[in-house]
């Protein structure tokens, strides 16, 4: 069953745009935008299952230069 989620990202100071740009090139990330507020970037992702979501967040998103913290909200 496909899984869709929003990844809320806190980035290093001045890195929001480059983080969003880097994330937009990651397979599974449908869109990523710098935003204002508590989080600096919001990404929308779609993957085939929860295991792939976990891998995407831990191995692809959290390793992008400038990413400090992530919070994942799975769409229901």
Question: For each predicted feature, which ranges?
Answer:
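A compositional/biophysical signature of low hydrophobicity enriched in polar/charged and small residues
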Residues: 1-76
């Amino acid at each position: 069953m496909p899984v869709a989620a929003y990844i809320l990202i806190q980035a290093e100071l001045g890195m929001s745009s480059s983080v969003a740009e880097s994330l937009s090139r990651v397979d599974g990330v449908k869109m990523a935008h710098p935003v204002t507020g508590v989080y600096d970037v919001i990404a929308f992702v779609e993957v085939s299952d929860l295991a792939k979501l976990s891998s995407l967040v831990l191995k692809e998103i959290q390793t992008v230069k400038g990413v400090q913290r992530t919070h994942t909200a799975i769409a229901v």
